[in-house]
Amino acid sequence: MSWAKQRVPFLDDDDGEEENDVQDDVDSPVPTRPLVIDEDAEPAAGTSGGLEGGGGDDEDGEDGHALPDLDDDLLLQFEPMLPRVYDLLLPSLDARLNFVNAGQKYAAFLKYVHGDCATCSHGEILREKTQLLTAIVSKLMDINGILEGKDEPAPGK
């Protein structure tokens, strides 16, 4: 299977400039250049294989990481999508992904609550699931009411 070169562009700053592939701020604890995944690459010493950008003493990187060769056939390339201020607030990749994911869920919830998702195909599914959950809770409460009613003696007997 042949994969074409793909770049995943994301917004970095509000200035509209495209970010370079080389890290601008050397003092930043998080590298800002893209992660390159190449399944056909030979594993370098000290790496698990397939990932370029890690490794020993390469001449390209100032921080001990090799810069990716952009002339190769790349499968996937990640670029930062958050402003640089989040480098300090969210130091790990997991923290950044969780931040973005929580923001997307919150935005989707607000659209659903305020009715802006009339054209959204997921809106009908959410309404059906809400109705189903309401019906299940109602049945459970009815069962509890029936069981509580059987414990009490009937008023006519």
UniProtKB/Swiss-Prot annotation:
Keywords: Host nucleus, Viral genome packaging, Viral release from host cell. Residues 1-69 are annotated as: Disordered. This is Tripartite terminase subunit 2. Pfam families: Herpes_UL33. Associates with TRM1 and TRM3 to form the tripartite terminase complex. InterPro entries: Herpes_TT2. One of its GO terms (cellular component) is host cell nucleus. Component of the molecular motor that translocates viral genomic DNA in empty capsid during DNA packaging. Forms a tripartite terminase complex together with TRM1 and TRM3 in the host cytoplasm. Once the complex reaches the host nucleus, it interacts with the capsid portal vertex. This portal forms a ring in which genomic DNA is translocated into the capsid. It is found in: Host nucleus. Belongs to the herpesviridae TRM2 protein family. Residues 11-27 have a biased composition (Acidic residues). One of its GO terms (biological process) is viral DNA genome packaging. Its main location: host cell.
